[in-house]
Structure formats: C-alpha cells, structure tokens
Amino acid sequence: QFYTDNKSFQLVFDRITTKWLADDTDPDGVEGWSRFKARVEQALRLITAEIDKNSRVIIFSSGGVISTALHLATGMSPYNAIRTGWRLVNTSITKFGYGRSGLVLHTFNSYPHLEYCQSGELITYR
C-alpha cells in the first residue's frame, strides 16, 4: 500500500533523516551529512571572511542549510536542529550574527510578512 498523507511522509522522512545523520558515508547519489555540513560551514566561512563588522548579508536558502546553521550556531544536536527545521515556514526569516564568538542565532523562523492574511493560507511548509 502506498501512503501519501503527511503523517506517513513524516514517519518515513524521520527514519531517512536519522539514518542520513548517523551514517558517515556518501551513498550512491546522496551527499552524506558530514560532507553537507562541511559544505555549509565552508560557505559561511567564505561569506564572513568577505564582510566587515557593519555589513549586512542576505542569503536565500533551504531548510536544510538553515537547520545546519542552527546546529552550528547553538550546538544543538544535528538531529534536533534538523527536526526543528521541519517547522520552518516557507519564506520565513532567520537571522544570524557573526563575531569573535562565531555564528550566533538572533531570530529563527520569523514570518510577520505572512501573518497579515487572517486565514493563514500564506503560511506553508516544505
């Protein structure tokens, strides 16, 4: 039987994510967690190396990258950061600061620009 409801999807997605985070290999056609995390860290290093302390940078990205940055900034476990990222609203705003202590989370999953619609129809996920 083929399940297409959100609850079934989430169950499968959780199992796959758990395996992805635990397995340090790169399965055929899939970038492993360690490599993905290293790529996100490298991108953040490149960006922060190019700016001065008064700069503002806007990055448009996916939930996976935002969740990985959340993990890096807070020390939250990769699993909990990814799970937290599952609640990211499409077009939400997450703000990080960068200084001597590294990456710091300022705002997570803010979406005041979508809350004007009373029905909530603009608030979507994934």
Per-region residue spans from a language model:
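Phosphate-handling substructures
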Residues: 1-39
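Short, well-ordered beta-to-alpha junction loops that form the rim of enzyme active sites
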Residues: 59-64
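Generic structural signal for well-ordered alpha-helical scaffold segments
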Residues: 41-49
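Acidic, low-complexity terminal tails and accessory targeting/binding regions
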Residues: 2-4, 34, 49, 53-56, ...
